[in-house]
Amino acid sequence: MVDALTYDDVYVNFTQEEWALLNPSQKSLYKDVMLETYRNLNAVGYNWEDSNIEEHCESSRRHGRHERNHTGEKPYEGIQYGEAFVHHSSLQMRKIIHTGEKRYKCNQCDKAYSRHSILQIHKRTHSGEKPYECNQCGKAFTQHSHLKIHMVTHTGEKPYKCDQCGKAFAFHSTLQVHKRTHTGEKPYECNQCSKAFAHHCHLRVHKRIHTGEKPYKCDQCGKAFVGQNDLKRHERVHTGEKPYKCNECGKAFVCNASLRTHKTTHTGVKPYECKQCTKSFASHGQLQKHERIHTGEKPYKCDQCGKAFASHDKFQKHERIHIGEKPYKCKQCTKSFASHDKLQKHERIHTGEKPYECKQCTKSFASHNKLQKHERIHTGEKPYKCDQCNKAFVYESYLQVHKKTHTGEKPYKCNECGKAFARHSHLKVHKITHTGEKPYKCNQCGKALAYHSTLQVHQRTHTGEKPYECEQCGKAFANQSYFQVHKRIHTGEKPYKCDQCGKAFVGSSDLKRHERVHTGRETLQM
């Protein structure tokens, strides 16, 4: 698949040394070629994002070019490509694009490029050179085009508007890419796994998953990344910079995508709809993640244990289990976390902030995930289905835990007493029996609890709140686990089976009580 032709594809850059070696006629020829290239691309509606282009061409021989405009003369015919070029050197450049020739090689990483100018830009990833500086905030960039894009964050100018959803963009090319989110067009396909992308740069970054290449390295901690944007986001962990601010509530974010998602909590707009279940999402990224529920696709695989993930975020979090990295530190209690979103959730324990509100019952939550879980109580949606017994679940994590009832797998083992558990959360609860730690205190009765979620359930004993209501008999519960057990009275489901006599039970606590009949241990009074 051949990419759309851009000015960079046909622009040939000379260093000062190379330019000095050219004779006057060669220099003149070069200027003419660049001017003609400018005109040709302009004629087909190319969107100019670099105002310096005309500076390359302003000394051209305009009179000679003007004459050819009248005569239509095109002395060099590219027969193989069915195109005519005004100069031989322009034809040569075009041939390089078609043949894929890459004669300019980096002496540090052996990566090769078709043009010297691109090699020079690439070398800056090794040297750290950022020659293009913003005169408003001092931020520096490796490429002039990146500086121009950054400048828009100061001016806010977005003249290009999508006629389908009204979203505005700073550049025409960005609008064209955005339109593909509506049409579903993905012209850039990976030749290794056939995954397709709407944007060529996304394909380039994706290919590094296959090659293992991570060319962008953090100067402070040495961590390497697949894409430049990933590095930029990571660097903000060290600097604490949050450049994207919500103009409604003043909340700031590390990346623009997080700000866009946050803004939907104010507007409620969800323009991205799933074609399989008609569920809508605030961002295209959220839609893509959701679609993997239907397809089962898990493109992110751990090299160490082989575990695969549907989202890159979950993959990154998992990687930190192996290396033990927790780069996100709470400034109030110095507790560290493997991911930024976990730190944010934790910080809300200190601030009490609950920015995510349910529109049906006005209940508020500290995280968007908790709001989503809660909303399924109202909708009854259970998108995750067990392929062995067809039981459906609200979340994939619940499905994974349920599957262990079929396999008997208990991968989470206590390193103090050897007891094993099906869920990591159950192991965490168990560990408290050894440590006795209870950091969460009820402000009404002073009772201390091991977990924030347990504190929330406990507080319902004071408020009388019972958010989990049975649709069949109307009985309500303060605790979701009690609600789940109660529903089995109606369905007749008894998932907990005694290994010794085969008797089945509605809840795990019922099974435990029964097992004491066999062991001879006294049953606890209820």
From Swiss-Prot:
Keywords tagged on the record: Differentiation, Metal-binding, Nucleus, Repeat, Repressor, Transcription, Transcription regulation, Zinc, Zinc-finger
A biological-process GO annotation: negative regulation of osteoblast differentiation
Gene Ontology molecular-function annotations: chromatin binding; histone deacetylase binding; RNA polymerase II cis-regulatory region sequence-specific DNA binding; zinc ion binding
UniProt zinc finger (C2H2-type) residues: 104-126, 132-154, 160-182, 188-210, 216-238, 244-266, 272-294, 300-322, 328-350, 356-378, 384-406, 412-434, 440-462, 468-490, 496-518
Localization in the cell: Nucleus
PROSITE patterns for the chain: KRAB, ZINC_FINGER_C2H2_1, ZINC_FINGER_C2H2_2
Major location (coarse): nucleus
Residue span, KRAB domain: 5-76
Tissues showing expression: Expressed in brain, heart, lung, thymus, spleen, lymph node, liver, kidney, muscle, testis, ovary, skin and uterus.
Cellular component, GO annotation: nucleus
Function field: Sequence-specific DNA binding transcriptional repressor. Represses target gene transcription by recruiting HDAC1 and HDAC2 histone deacetylases. Acts as a specific transcriptional repressor for PTCH1 during embryonic development. Required for osteoblast differentiation and sonic hedgehog/SHH signaling response. Binds to the consensus site 5'-GCGCCC-3' in the promoter of PTCH1.
Domain text: The KRAB domain is necessary for its repressive activity.
The protein's assembly and partners: Interacts (via KRAB domain) with HDAC2; the interaction is direct. Interacts (via KRAB domain) with HDAC1.
Listed name of the protein: Zinc finger protein 431
Underlying gene: Znf431
